[in-house]
Swiss-Prot record:
Name this polypeptide is given: DNA-directed RNA polymerase subunit beta''
Upper classification of the organism: Eukaryota, Viridiplantae, Streptophyta, Mesostigmatophyceae, Mesostigmatales
Binding site for Zn(2+): 233, 307, 314, 317
Keywords per UniProt: Chloroplast, DNA-directed RNA polymerase, Metal-binding, Nucleotidyltransferase, Plastid, Transcription, Transferase, Zinc
Family as reported in the entry's similarity comment: Belongs to the RNA polymerase beta' chain family. RpoC2 subfamily.
Cellular component terms per the entry's GO annotation: chloroplast; DNA-directed RNA polymerase complex; mitochondrion
Subcellular location: Plastid, Chloroplast
Function of the protein: DNA-dependent RNA polymerase catalyzes the transcription of DNA into RNA using the four ribonucleoside triphosphates as substrates.
Domain of life: Eukaryota
Pfam families: RNA_pol_Rpb1_4 (PF05000), RNA_pol_Rpb1_5 (PF04998)
EC number from the UniProt entry: 2.7.7.6
């Protein structure tokens, strides 16, 4: 924690020669990290662990002595904060003024406000640090944050500086910053804004942590079988390494990238005239520096991407194990290490992004400030004027220019690069520390996105365009829209109170009329269309209510030959209508319900159409029915007749056939047991239906069995009806209507003569009608109607009684009155009453806008009076709350008519001598502009009246509209406060953080084709195909797959790295290379040639290359990239694939194909409980693996010999010996 420590280290690991050196540095977190790394490299892990342990004890000892803790007095706020905030507020007030007079657009104002607060926040952050250093370097807050023990600069600045700008839940920056810090305490508004970001942080952290964890799981699954299995695969190829750059800035130097790699070429030094490094030599930090002195870029190194080992990586292609800075050991599970290295920062980043709770951190342009007071001089030759993003006019340099600031005693010279924005005019006076220029970074097309901002009206009034030309364009959806022209212009709102009426309200005034407060502006009549008796609701009509009703009784009927009774029990209640013949009707609607034309209101209770069992229904030829009615679940009868019912008893069983107690086609008596606990209710022929030993149903068909002398004579009588008196066969005459059916019995074929029951279906007109007494008109009636429940020929599967026809009572309304409402009054022990009303709602909200008017509604007719159609019942007068001159819009709107009232509140009078010299009618005046010598305009407005010594302005507000903006209003329109005027289109830099980072990583590693149902441009599949097409032309089809894979692999590695680098996270390339190797190892067969492969099959590239060497007609194939999920499911091991996803599918497929799992990976061995083939278990597996490989000669690959293994083991033994420590 202290400022300075004397630390002594022995340079060699030899314990006897204790050569010490003095390390005179401030020991903060970074320095301790460097020391530990150096110690680890020079002294091994055991000694380092011991040293770190002693460092810990030393740290705790001094921490205990110091007793550092945080008290509220330690949070000292820099005094400069007050004037920094005052400066920012002055700058923003100036910006707001410019916006209100139409000098800058809403977007420019917003960006200026954001940038002002951001730079204030940054400046204050630096002031905080300086203040601590100058006043109290031993301040606990300062020591904790800057030693790296706890907290960071951002958190300290929020404690004692200002919290700064925050984002809202949509990620947009709120232009109201949090000026306070936590020491001073937040205001209520600031606290609420602050909570936005904190809540968003918590939710996002939870979601991203899950995403990151799942990413790690998929990566582990895809790479778990990547193990270092041999020393050298013998490859001659490698990849070219150079520094990683973001625009001009080096993000990842070549020195760093080379450390831990193995060279694939010899490096020759022309100065020393000798090789300083040889092929297959691993690169240490010192060697990396030497190589970079000779070659700046394109150094050929070995890589897991080009390793020839099958389903593994060799030691030399992998390079160092980053854990201990030596060549990786045999049996190291590098796949799992790679997966964790890529997946883990996802979680970490997720946490890190949101620690500050959504504080906005944008990238600020490099600023150039004057170091002295003086006069600024520069050449204007290589500059052109431009509008900055803050709407200010500035100069931008087209080449490097020199700026000179001439002070009283000295000069200050600075050379600024191309694309520098000069914010101060040539020859102006500048103060020390004043911002004079900003160096703008070259804009990358990918870092810019098109954004939009809506501008709403600040007050109501009339739209007026100044120098604003419109172009009519079509949107992406084909809608027409107005776009501002190339140069934009000004959109003015001329003040006035805007009123809107519905179209059918007649206005009582005209344009240019003067309206007085309390005068009638419009009158709305409430008219009865149908006539009748005017009534009110039960609660008396309150006319001043905005939603009141008037009722006009159009007609009323009362049933006189029937009365209502109310039945109620524990389960339900119902109304029964009983007529003078004691026929009962079950009411289907409740009291006071509104009913429609043709609606069923009651059902006739009768047993006339009940059957004993199920059966077959047949219509006679006279019957005609309408289409099926869903409400009544029946067919309305248009014309009556007879329906025939052939009874049969059906039992649906669905049980095992062995339970059946009767035989198929056996005649059974009523009461016979069919299966246990199930008896038949009718006598007849039993027919059994079963499938696959499951008993489906048993049908009992009543009737008599007759065996004809000659069965062929009755074949054509199967399923026919025989009328009474007709011959059945062999001279037998039918006594009544019967149904014939041929049946096959065990003793031979026979005829089943089945009984038929007939039901009479009358016409609806023949049914008895209820008698009614009418009041007013006969516009409504109750009509009986009969419905058949089943269609002709339908078989009804049932054993209990069924209803085959129903009689209903339905309401009929005259066709011209269908819009009217009909209600039923059900009164117990009284008559049924039906009334038809015309409801007239006084909905004043539809007619007018209440904020602007008063209204008075008067009844012009008395209640209970009869009125004829078209009579006015009430009048609503709309009374003006304001006074003033009326202006009407020339435009016809589809829904509303609008007008505007302008009074003295919308005007301002200026006393000016000789007004005619300076003004003309219609002139537009900007606030703050000199209108006559010595007089500035106090408000913006339009000249509407001129007299010799006075000018009347109509107050107005200008809005600057940029080019290509989309306008939602037109010249002359009336708008209210808050209406959207225009959508400004602008470019903004994309803000990068892990919220975009993790999905991008997933998009790359899963090789996504689409995003949000839209195809992804430049997705990996399209890129690979284009690389393959190029390579085929250049190298031929045999080499094309390999070459296109190499290109895609490098692209993928760089893309993944760029996402992590943007977050400041360091991941070694080799980890990403291991994963990418797994994604790009397979090809898809297009033509099998002489191989046994089928088109569409996926196979590893090295296998198909070996196969093609041994056949005359080569197989054709194309490279494919598999996402990590697909690669996991397409792995050689089905046990591993099944444990990942789609277990049943993977195992079923493996079983059908008779697959063998060779248990090469870690996962499959863990699952079946064997020793894993990594670490200590490697040698056991390696012997078996080598034996497996020696059996398959087709692969043609040389594996490492035992002598190489011994050499490596000896080398490792040496390292381990070095690591022993004697305390």
């Amino acid at each position: 924690m202290g400022r300075m420590k004397k630390i002594f280290f022995n340079q060699k690991s030899d314990l006897n020669s204790m050569k010490l050196f003095f390390c005179n540095r401030i020991m903060n977190k970074g320095e301790i990290r460097r020391i530990i790394a150096w110690f680890l490299f020079n002294h091994g892990t055991s000694r380092t662990a011991h040293m770190v342990d002693r460092l810990k004890i030393l740290g705790f000892y001094h921490a205990t002595k110091a007793g550092i803790s945080l008290s509220i007095d330690d949070l000292s706020i820099p005094p400069t904060k007050k004037w920094l905030l005052e400066d920012a507020e002055q700058e923003i007030a100036k910006t707001q003024k410019n916006y209100s007079i139409g000098k800058i657009t809403a977007v420019e104002r917003f960006q200026k406000v954001i940038d002002t607060w951001h730079s204030t926040s940054e400046t204050l952050k630096n002031e905080v640090v300086q203040y601590f250093e100058q006043t109290n370097p031993l301040n606990p807050v300062y020591m904790m944050a800057f030693s790296g023990a706890r907290g960071n600069l951002s958190q300290v600045s929020q404690l004692v500086g200002m919290r700064g700008l925050m984002s809202d839940p949509q990620g947009q920056i709120i232009d109201l910053p949090i000026r306070s810090n936590f020491r001073e305490g937040l205001t209520v508004t600031e606290y609420v804004i602050s909570c936005y970001g904190a809540r968003k942080g918590l939710v996002d952290t939870a979601l991203r942590t899950a995403d990151s964890g799942y990413l790690t799981r998929r990566l582990v699954d895809v790479a778990q079988d990547m193990i270092i299995r041999e020393t050298d695969c013998g490859t001659k190829s490698g990849i070219l390494l150079g520094p990683v750059k973001d625009e001009q800035k080096v993000v990842f130097s070549l020195q760093e990238r080379l450390i831990g790699r193995v060279l694939a070429e010899n490096i020759y030094s022309p100065k020393q005239k000798q090789y300083i490094a040889k092929k297959n030599q691993d690169i240490s930090a010192s060697l990396s520096d030497k190589i970079c002195e000779i070659k700046r870029t394109n150094i050929l190194v070995r890589s897991p991407l080009t390793c020839k080992s099958i389903r593994s990586v060799c030691q030399l292609c992998y390079g160092w194990s980053l854990a201990h800075g030596n060549l990786v050991d045999l049996g190291e599970a590098v796949g799992i290490i790679a997966a964790q290295s890529i997946g883990e920062p996802g979680t970490q980043l997720t946490m890190r992004t949101f620690h500050t709770g959504g504080v906005f951190t944008g990238n600020i342009a490099k600023q150039i400030r004057s170091s002295i007071d003086g006069k600024i001089i520069y050449s204007l030759t290589n500059t052109i004027p431009m509008r900055t993003r803050h709407g200010e006019i500035a100069l931008i340099t087209q080449s490097n220019i020199n700026i000179c600031i001439q002070g009283k005693n000295k000069e200050f010279n600075i050379e600024v690069p191309i694309n520098t924005i000069l914010l101060v005019n040539n020859g102006s006076m500048v103060r020390a520390k004043q911002l004079i220029a900003e160096v703008s970074a070259p804009v990358n097309a990918q870092s810019v996105e098109i954004a939009s901002k809506y501008v709403a009206s600040d007050f109501s009034g009339e739209i007026h365009f100044e120098n604003l030309l419109l172009q009519e364009k079509k949107s992406a959806y084909g809608h027409k829209m107005n776009r501002a022209g190339q140069y934009g212009g000004l959109l003015w709102i001329l003040s006035g109170q805007v009123y809107k009426f519905s179209l059918d309200v007649p206005l009582m005034f005209d344009t240019a009329d003067y309206i007085h407060n309390g005068s009638c502006m419009a009158e709305h009549n409430i008219i009865s269309q149908y006539g009748g008796i005017l009534q009110t609701s039960e609660n008396n009509l309150t006319i001043d209510n905005s939603n009141s009703y008037l009722y006009v009784l159009n007609s009323s009927m009362t049933i006189i030959n029937a009365y209502l009774s109310h039945i109620k029990n524990a389960r339900s209640e119902a109304y029964i209508l009983t007529d003078d013949l004691n026929q009962k009707f079950f009411m289907q609607v409740e009291s006071n319900n509104v009913i429609k034309n043709n609606q069923i209101i009651a059902k006739f209770v009768t047993k006339t159409y009940l059957t004993n069992t199920g059966g077959i229904l047949k219509y006679s030829s006279e019957i005609e029915v309408d289409e099926y009615d869903i409400v009544t679940q029946s067919y309305p009868v248009r014309k009556g007749g007879i329906i025939m019912w052939i009874p049969e008893e059906t039992h649906l069983i669905n049980k095992d056939a062995s339970l059946l107690m009767v035989r198929d086609c056996e005649y059974v008596e009523a009461g016979t047991q069919i299966i246990k606990d199930l008896i038949c209710h009718s006598s007849g022929l039993a027919q059994v239906s079963q499938t696959n030993d499951i008993l489906r149903e048993v049908v009992i068909k009543p009737g008599k069995i007759y065996r004809p002398i000659d069965f062929s004579q009755v074949l054509d009588k199967h399923q026919t009806l025989i009328q009474a008196g007709e011959e059945i066969c062999d001279g037998i005459i039918a006594e009544e209507l019967v149904y014939l059916e041929n049946v096959n019995l065990s003793s031979g074929s026979a005829l089943l003569i089945r009984p038929v029951v007939q039901f009479l279906i009358p016409n609806s007109t023949e049914l008895k009608k209820l008698e009614a007494q009418y009041q007013l008109k006969q516009n409504i009636s109750i009509q009986p109607s009969i419905h058949i429940c089943y269609k002709d020929g339908q078989r009804i599967h049932a054993w209990q009684s069924m209803e085959i026809a129903k009689i209903f009572l339905r309401l009929e309304i005259d066709s011209h009155l269908h819009k009217l409402n009909v209600t039923l009054n059900l009164i117990e022990n009284k008559l049924l009453q039906i009334k038809m009303f015309e409801y007239l709602m006084i909905d004043l909200n539809q007619i007018i806008d209440f904020q602007s008017y008063q209204n008075v509604t008067r009844l012009v007719r008395k209640f209970n009076n009869y009125i004829i159609p078209g009579t006015i019942l009430a009048k609503t007068e709309i009374i003006a709350k304001d006074h003033g001159e009326v202006r009407q819009s020339n435009k016809n709107f589809e829904e509303q008519k609008s007008f505007l009232i302008m009074n003295e509140h919308d005007q301002m009078t200026l006393f000016v001598k000789n007004a005619y010299e300076f003004f003309q009618l219609g002139d537009l005046v900007h606030k703050g502009k000199e209108i006559v010598p010595g007089i500035l305009a106090p408000q913006s407005g339009q000249v509407i009246q001129l007299q010799a010594n006075r000018v009347t302005l109509r107050l107005a507000r200008p809005y600057l509209v940029s080019s290509e903006a989309v306008l939602y209003v037109d010249d002359g329109d009336f708008v209210k406060s808050g209406d959207t005027l225009v959508m400004l289109i602008f470019e903004q830099s994309k803000t990068g953080d892990i919220v975009q980072g993790l999905p991008r990583i997933e998009e790359l590693l899963e090789a996504r084709r689409t995003k949000g149902l839209k195809p992804l441009p430049n997705n990996l599949h399209d890129l690979l195909q284009s690389f393959f097409d190029e390579a085929t032309e250049k190298y031929g089809i045999q080499k094309a797959a390999k070459k296109s894979f190499e290109k895609l692999q490098l692209f993928l590695v760089n893309e993944v790295q760029s996402v992590y680098k943007a977050q400041g996270v360091h991941i070694s390339d080799k980890h990403i290379e291991v994963i990418v190797r797994q994604m790009t190892s397979k090809v898809m067969i297009e033509e099998g040639g002489d191989t046994t492969l089928l088109p569409g099959e996926l196979i590893e590239l090295h296998r198909i290359e070996n196969m093609n060497r041994n056949v005359s007609v080569h197989a054709k194939y194309k490279p494919i990239v598999l996402g990590i999920t697909k690669a996991s499911l397409n792995t050689e091991s089905f046990i591993s694939a099944a444990s990942f996803q789609e277990t049943t599918r993977v195992l079923t497929k493996a079983a059908i194909e008779g697959k063998t799992d060779w248990l090469r990976g870690l996962k499959e061995n863990v699952i079946i409980g064997r020793l894993i083939p990594a670490g200590t278990g490697f040698n056991v597996h390696d012997k078996m693996y080598s034996r497996d490989l020696s059996l398959s000669n087709s692969y043609n690959l040389a594996y490492s010999s035992n002598s190489q293994h011994k050499r490596i083991e000896q080398k490792n033994a040496e390292y381990n010996f070095e690591d022993i420590i004697f305390d």
